[in-house]
Amino acid sequence: MTRNKHIWIFNAGNSYSGNPKWLFEYIRRHHPDIRTVWMCYHKDVRNYVKRLGYEACLFDSTAGKTIMKEAGVYVVEMCKEVFQPELEGITILNLWHGVGCKSIERKVTGGFLQERIAKKYIRNNRIYKNAQLFLVTSELMEKHFMEQCGIDEELLIRAGYPRCTVTDPVCTYPHDIRAIKGLSDDARIVVYAPTYRDYAKENFIKAAIPDMDRLTQVLQGENILLVLKMHPLVEKDTEYLQVKAQYEHCPNLLFWDNANDIYEIFEDVDAAIIDYSLS
């Protein structure tokens, strides 16, 4: 089967975000010779991308299966667990989603993700080894990802992350979060973006912020808007949802909706509290 190198399909899980989104936006603007299609698992994401004026398909739709058979490049930002049969023979461009400072993928030896990771490498190892190009951002990260993911050096691409290097303005949601929360234009924006814990993705937020009332008092006194941006594996945690329900109307707290790409407003962020990456 001959694949068309001028058709690129993209996916970043269950949202329009991440490095695939930023490369998607860049190619649409600067490479009109390439057809770009955003692939979706759910109708709400497909409809959202279509409302932006872009082409989008569901993986399990007739149109989606057709475009998967034709496309030459599949852009992702993770080592996917599932590759649809229609993707056989496609080139995978893995942009990854954050620099590495912990054990990932093949080097994971415990935690709640270990079994899923082991299964996907048993199932997909041939694809990872033979069809996947992998983006790395430095010599240090080359060594890290070669060890952690079993990537051969000749399959590495050395470049910056699209979400950090693409300078085209992108606006897929209202950016004036100060006004949305009723704060003044000179309010400072601070983002708190922790990653999940390997051995406990649940009951994290109250341990991290034991006195929310005191925190909100300080934020109000300092005229700070604190954006709580949880990892997708944490945002559905019962404890986090309880805190969100109790404090979401506080003008100095914004519980971030991961459907919105926080990188669109990064130029307006004054400080970030992070412990890994902002994916």
What do these predicted regions represent?
Residues S15-E25, R29, Q148, R158, ...:
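Conserved catalytic-core segment of nucleotide-activated headgroup transferases in glycan assembly
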Residues E81-V82, M141-K143, D198, V234, ...:
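Glycine-rich nucleotide phosphate-binding loop and flanking beta-alpha elements
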Residues C57-A71, P232-S279:
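Donor nucleotide-activated moiety binding/catalytic core segment of transferases
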Residues W8-C171:
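Active-site and donor-binding regions of nucleotide-sugar-utilizing enzymes
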